[in-house]
Structure formats: C-alpha cells, structure tokens
Amino acid sequence: MDGERKIKIALTKGRIEKEAVKIFERAGVDCSEVINKGRKLIFHNMESNIDFVLVKAPDVLTYVEHGVVDIGIVGKDTLLEQDKNFYEVLDLGFGKCKFSLAGLKDSNFYSGYNRKKIATKYPNVARSYFRKLGQDVEIIKIEGSVELAPILGLADAIVDIVETGSTLKENGLVIYKDICSISARMVVNMASMKMKKEEIEKIINKVQVQINEIEKAVR
C-alpha cells in the first residue's frame, strides 16, 4: 500500500497462531497463506503490507526485542518468564489459563520450616512468586512432565500452567494456590512503535475492535 511501511508480525506456532489468524482475518487481513502453510514459515501479504513469521514461543520476544519483527503474538507466560524489552499493547483474550502452585493431595506443603523444593519449567515465574511471599525455596528446572517431580520425590510442589486441571487430577495432584491468569498478548518492538507508529497503531486498533466484538458476542 502506497506510503505505508511493511510490518512484520511473529506468531507463536500452534494454538496461539491459529487463534491469532482468526482475529486478523476478521480484521480484514488475508491469512489464507498462513492457514494453508505447509512447511513454510514466512508469509507475505502484499495487499495489507504485512509479513507473518511463525516461530516457537520462546523466540518471539527475541525477534521482537532485536527488531527483526515489529509485532509479536505470544502467551503471557512467555512474557513473565523472559526478561526482554518490549511494549505489551493488547490482551487478545484467547489462550486463557493460569499459573498455579500444585502438589500431592495428601502433602502438608505449608507445614514445617524446611526449605521447600519447587519443580517448574518457569524458574523466573516461580522465583518471583516466592520472593514476593518472602519465602526461600529451591527452584528445580524441569523440561518434561513437571507433574512427575512431586510423585517421585524430587520436589515438594510444582509451579506450572493449568488449563482444566485434568492432568493434575489424573496424577493425584491438586492446586494449592493460583498465582496469576494468562492469555495471549500482542507485544511491539520499542523502536518500531516510534518509527512505524501509524502503521502499528492501525493494526492495534483493528485487532482491538475485533476483540471487543468477540467479547460482546460471548456475554
């Protein structure tokens, strides 16, 4: 489009990508190439002057921070875990879940004065939570099924993302405390927000309108 600068948007691969595409389509951006992507990772929309890039969640903020892309669509869990520089501009209202502290049903987690061991895929989130409580804990980073840690005696509890709670229940775990809510967010590179202010604000406004309409429809 004449006079408008190209905007590059990084989408988190998977469920967030699919939900984000629905909103962009509603906002008038043709995402047919992304929908029928095959093995492609980069998509050019000449009409809207937008490029979409598909990346894994932890990499979205890296691309945004370094200015390789202007906008990122990523879960709040990733924002909380990574210490990056960006503007968080929109709560997109999908991908809703929560960070929770959980452990064995019959455990006395809150009793005793021993230093508790906490297993998690999100050490920074867990560390921040217990720091606010003034509680000294040992954080153990886990890459796989974190539910195994208390079952096998590696940890006293876990900090993890919970959606329905069914996985916890099936493994004999219960939620001790909900830490915070999570959903998909739109973030913007700090320099891009200044250099491409008009183009980016146009996208933000279009997406915001669609979010508002979706929220009205489900009330």
UniProtKB/Swiss-Prot annotation:
Under catalytic activity, the entry for this protein gives: 1-(5-phospho-beta-D-ribosyl)-ATP + diphosphate = 5-phospho-alpha-D-ribose 1-diphosphate + ATP
> Where is this gene product found?
Cytoplasm
**Which pathway or pathways does this protein act in?**
Amino-acid biosynthesis; L-histidine biosynthesis; L-histidine from 5-phospho-alpha-D-ribose 1-diphosphate: step 1/9
The GO terms describing molecular function are: ATP binding; ATP phosphoribosyltransferase activity
One GO BP annotation is:
L-histidine biosynthetic process
Against PROSITE patterns, the record matches this protein to:
ATP_P_PHORIBOSYLTR
- Which coarse location class applies to the principal site listed for this UniProt protein? cytoplasm
Similarity comment: family membership: Belongs to the ATP phosphoribosyltransferase family. Short subfamily.
- Name of the molecule in the record: ATP phosphoribosyltransferase
The species this protein was found in: Clostridium kluyveri (strain ATCC 8527 / DSM 555 / NBRC 12016 / NCIMB 10680 / K1)
Write the lineage as a comma-separated list.
Bacteria, Bacillati, Bacillota, Clostridia, Eubacteriales
Q: Which gene encodes it?
A: hisG
